[in-house]
């Protein structure tokens, strides 16, 4: 008999609810029979008045909603964040206002490229999205398991995803397209090296890091801003999968990561992460050798050390995956007082695109769904109506300002002010210091055996590409380090013979 909680979910339900509920139609009417349609005689035709069938089938025809265009396959869980260290000198956000304070949260982990039925153990970045239900609104930190990303300008995102997804004619994944994109956008090299290193296939979701990746801005009660980055380190340690083992799991247990997370929580082996921040003053940002808002780069820990903030604990599985995970909507635009945006071009682009895709996928009132609503800070807006609206602010005035005590503003949540200069233009950033940090990753972070595996992993996927793509990628990695390019060229040549 299976021993994992995930294998025994139905048995657990039976034991939890010994008395079955009377089955009903969607309008709550009890049903006499759910095993036969209504017909005129034993062999006669169905009747249009069979509302039990019509009710069931009409809803079944509409069960699916649009799949996420990226991050379609994922797992979710509930938990809490607890402050363990005081950072109020940096941030006035309510959830950080005292040590020991706990804030409920929802997390969603995911792969990026695959569809909702794809395997969990592929070489792919992992989504690491958090929704903090704070007393001053929901804060969504929508990150990944790497501190960097492939591109630094949001205009490239649709084309990157097109190259990552299926070929429009063959409907197959096309490594030529993906490596061609990376070859033509060399700012991606840093993240490509992360992806093809040992870190590229985490061992499930419990043993991977999490990062906000972008540069954000924190503001304290005095109104003083500082730039920051968010980091999450698993208390249970970091582990990755060997590519051979990952390939076997992809066929034998494609839901490996989802299963592992569910069973750990159900067995009360609660996953935990420590949260850290890095901070950079405005003066330091002006003097730094790189663009501090470039998401293809990291802030060196030696110059900007990690500052511990608190811990995140996942202690409750979802009751219904569709309601609590599939309908969950994480959005970088959802910030709270004390957390603000930086000029990071990718972050600025995501502020729009995530909201827009939620409107498409879930409708204009997605924020009213229980999993998305700011239940600890009731929303008071002038937004009204729209499809599936069930919370339309009652009889309050639907305009602002008004003379009828409808709403008021708060002076203490004013955004910080900042200066900006420069000509309005489209600034190409494709050649902005693309190789220095990848070179440090090769020379100082990776050990010799890790470099060998990085080269081998790249050669394995590049081996199926056109020769011109192979040569182009070898050229790019040679710019990182001659040894890197030579080793990759050697392995690709061996595959040809």
UniProtKB/Swiss-Prot annotation:
EC number: 1.11.1.6
The keyword Iron is annotated on this UniProt entry: yes
Top class in the EC scheme: oxidoreductase
GO molecular function annotation: catalase activity; heme binding; metal ion binding
Pfam family of the protein (one): Catalase
Annotated heme binding sites: 354
Gene disruption: observed consequences: No defects in lifespan or egg laying capacity. Abolishes ctl-1 enzymatic activity and reduces the global levels of catalase activity to 75% of the total catalase activity observed in wild-type animals.
Active site: 71, 144
GO-annotated cellular components: cytoplasm; mitochondrion; peroxisome
InterPro entries, alphabetized: Catalase, Catalase_3, Catalase_AS, Catalase_clade1/3, Catalase_core, Catalase_haem_BS, Catalase_immune_responsive, Catalase_sf
GO biological process, one term: response to hydrogen peroxide
Catalytic activity: 2 H2O2 = O2 + 2 H2O
Cofactor requirements of the protein: heme
Induction pattern: Up-regulated in response to Cu(2+). Up-regulated in response to phoxim (an organophosphorus insecticide) and carbaryl (a carbamate insecticide).
Keyword terms, alphabetized: Heme, Hydrogen peroxide, Iron, Metal-binding, Oxidoreductase, Peroxidase
PANTHER family assigned to the protein according to its UniProt record, in alphabetical order: CATALASE
Stated role: Catalase involved in the oxidative stress response serving to protect cells from toxicity. For instance plays a role in defending against oxidative damage induced by excessive copper stress. Not required for maintaining normal lifespan.
Family designation: Belongs to the catalase family.
Protein name: Catalase-2
């Amino acid at each position: 008999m299976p021993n994992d909680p995930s294998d025994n979910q139905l048995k657990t339900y039976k034991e939890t609810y010994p008395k079955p509920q009377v089955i009903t139609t969607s309008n709550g009417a009890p049903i006499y029979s759910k095993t036969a349609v209504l017909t005129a005689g034993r062999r006669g035709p169905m009747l249009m008045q069979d509302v039990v069938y019509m009710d069931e089938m009409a809803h079944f025809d509409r069960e699916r909603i649009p799949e996420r265009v990226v991050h379609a396959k994922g797992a979710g869980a509930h938990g809490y964040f607890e402050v363990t260290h005081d950072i109020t000198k940096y941030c006035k956000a309510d959830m950080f206002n005292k040590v020991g304070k706990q804030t409920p949260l929802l997390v969603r982990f995911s792969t990026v490229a695959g569809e909702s039925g794809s395997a969990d153990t592929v070489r792919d970045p992992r989504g690491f999205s958090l929704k903090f239900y704070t007393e001053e609104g929901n804060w969504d930190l929508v990150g990944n398991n790497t501190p960097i990303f492939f591109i630094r300008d949001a205009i490239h995102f649709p084309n990157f995803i097109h190259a990552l997804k299926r070929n429009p004619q063959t409907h197959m994944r096309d490594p030529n397209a993906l490596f061609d994109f990376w070859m033509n956008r060399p700012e991606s090299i840093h993240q490509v090296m992360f992806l093809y290193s040992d870190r590229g296939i985490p061992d499930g979701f419990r043993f991977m890091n999490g990062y906000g990746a972008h540069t954000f801005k924190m503001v304290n009660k005095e109104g003083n801003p500082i730039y920051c980055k968010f980091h999450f380190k698993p208390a249970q340690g970091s582990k990755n999968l060997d590519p051979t083992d990952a390939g076997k799991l992809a066929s034998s247990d494609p839901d490996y990561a989802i299963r592992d997370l569910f069973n750990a929580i159900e067995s009360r082996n609660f996953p935990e992460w420590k949260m850290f921040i890095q901070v950079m003053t405005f003066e330091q940002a002006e003097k730094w050798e790189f663009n501090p808002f470039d998401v293809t780069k990291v802030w060196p820990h030696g110059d900007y050390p990690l500052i511990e903030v608190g811990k995140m604990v996942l202690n409750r599985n979802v009751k219904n995956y569709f309601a609590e995970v599939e309908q969950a909507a994480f959005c970088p635009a959802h910030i709270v007082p004390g957390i603000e945006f930086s000029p990071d071009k990718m972050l600025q682009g995501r502020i729009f695109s995530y909201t827009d895709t939620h409107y498409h996928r879930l409708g204009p009132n997605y924020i009213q769904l229980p999993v998305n609503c700011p239940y600890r800070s009731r929303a008071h807006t002038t937004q009204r109506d729209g499809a599936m609206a069930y919370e339309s602010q009652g009889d309050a005035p639907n305009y602002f300002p008004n003379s009828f005590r409808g709403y008021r503003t708060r002076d203490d949540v004013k955004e910080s002010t900042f200066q900006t200069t420069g000509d309005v233009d489209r600034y190409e950033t494709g050649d902005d210091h693309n190789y220095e940090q990848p070179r440090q990753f090769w020379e100082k972070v990776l050990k010799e055996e890790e470099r060998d595996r990085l080269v081998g992993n790249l050669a394995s996927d590049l081996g199926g590409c056109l020769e011109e793509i192979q040569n182009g990628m070898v050229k790019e990695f040679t710019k990182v380090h001659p040894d890197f390019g030579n080793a990759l060229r050697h392995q690709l040549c061996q595959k040809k013979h």
